[in-house]
Regions:
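ABC transporter nucleotide-binding domain
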Residues: 181-281
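Conserved catalytic motifs of ABC-family nucleotide-binding domains
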Residues: 160
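Catalytic Walker B motif of ABC-type/P-loop ATPase nucleotide-binding domains
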Residues: 164-168
Length: 332
């Protein structure tokens, strides 16, 4: 069992050898993981088993085998109690078009057991928090995709849950809308102390937003670690330089100068506008930085960027693919 816990060793979600099999596919395969408080990302490609796991954790779909607990409650026998304490933002559009956000969220609050006055008060507060207060009386059918996502988020929060499941909350949003939604997700925990399990296939979003990340592929656990562990710095140094009249290809000039000093490099396309390509090399210490600085200065070029590369969550999938290919090779 891989653990993600706080210093207090509090577990919000726990699964042990959890499996879910359908006639032609295994959606979850002996998944064992513990998740602590905070914002946790659940990442995997479409079909990896993310939505299936959420449905099991909500007590909406039985597991084939294994067990799971949410907030200390067994999902097999305490589904209703779990749903009282947990909010859920589904992936797909499921909102009634002819009612206002206020009417819908009040209804969902009442369904959660809040009395009428408290439901209206909580709805107003929640819609203000998600940025829909000015538009709260308009029919949902006239909302943009981003506004509809905020309504779904509001109904997940209105009953003041201890934990929320957000299934692909940035789907259909433009870059600005995604950034705003990610900010809201982060504040759910920092401002209100609500733990979050958020699914996404956009790995960069999770790196920026989450405290911890759980990676699953084909229903199996690939890795479960803090985001800091996933994104540790590497020994690879990325440098980018400008061109000049004397050196129309500044990147090539730097590469040749470094090679002359016994430093191997390789290139990577995609530099900033007006700058050359990026060179990658292995940093062996401070002397590498000094050498690059001196080479660029001697050539009379501008240094646009010199930074250590970080690992990314996507490397977990690359490593998994490599291991599968190696296993197939050995099997042949």
């Amino acid at each position: 069992v891989v653990r993600i816990t706080t210093v207090e060793d509090v577990t919000v979600i726990a699964t042990e050898s959890l499996s879910k099999r359908f006639p032609r596919v295994t959606a979850l395969d002996r998944l064992s993981v513990d998740i602590g408080p905070g914002v946790t990302g659940l990442v995997g490609a479409n079909g990896a088993g993310k939505s299936t796991l959420i449905k099991i954790l909500l007590g909406l779909s039985p597991a084939t085998e294994g067990r799971a607990e949410v907030l200390g409650l067994d999902v097999a026998t305490k589904g209703a109690a779990i749903r009282e304490r947990v909010g859920y933002m589904p992936e797909h559009d499921c909102l009634p078009p002819d009612v206002s956000a206020t009417e819908f969220v009040v209804h969902m609050a009442r369904m959660s057991g809040l009395p009428p006055a408290a439901a209206r008060e909580r709805t107003a507060d929640t819609l203000r928090h998600v940025g829909l207060y000015e538009e709260r009386y308009r029919p949902i059918g006239g909302y943009s995709t981003g506004m509809k996502q905020r309504v779904k988020l509001a109904q997940a929060l209105v009953h003041d849950p201890q934990l929320v499941f957000l299934d692909e909350p940035t789907n259909g949003l433009d870059p600005v809308g995604r950034d705003e939604m990610l900010g809201l997700i982060r504040r759910i925990h920092t401002d209100f102390g609500i733990s979050v399990l958020v699914t996404s296939h956009l790995l960069g979003e999770l790196e920026r937003t989450c405290d911890h990340v759980v990676v699953i592929d084909g229903g199996k656990l690939l890795r479960s670690s803090s985001t800091t562990d996933f994104t540790q710095t590497t020994t690879t140094l990325a440098i980018e330089v400008t061109d000049s009249d004397a050196h129309p290809d500044g990147t090539r000039a730097v590469r040749e100068a470094l090679h002359a000093r016994g430093v191997d490099t390789h290139g990577e396309a995609g530099g900033l506008p007006g700058a050359g390509h990026i060179l990658l090399l292995t940093a062996t210490g401070e002397e590498t930085y000094d050498l690059v600085r001196d080479v660029v200065a001697d050539l009379g070029l501008g240094l646009v960027r010199m930074e250590q590369r970080r690992h990314h969550i996507s490397e977990v999938f690359t490593s998994s693919d490599d291991q599968r290919k190696e296993a197939v090779g050995h099997g042949g």
